[in-house]
């Protein structure tokens, strides 16, 4: 989407909110309990993406986490927030957190949202950069987070 693009620093951060019907390709995982989340073959979700400078990227991560919590609070869905350990965050991420909603029918919390703080991992491959007001060009930082996974949270 922004491969080989250079943003002006004053344009940052750039944020997107997208809605999509997603499909899982993993055969045989539908309905299975996989590390605290129930896999669904098809699901609808809203996803947040952010392109920012190194100085503001952690604030973007906190903003996305805050949006997730706000939505759960507005819907009055009991939840807990977890900071993921290094083993669970995946290769591109420097930091990650999950929101788990309380599912009374299962008498347990289940993952419904995730937020990933990726620093410049994605922009290195994409060569997505920012031109500072000083003229220096450097890699941007990226964040992504589930705004709302309709089937999971409801």
List each model region and its residues.
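TRNA-recognition modules of translation machinery and tRNA-sensing kinases, especially anticodon-binding
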Residues: 1-154
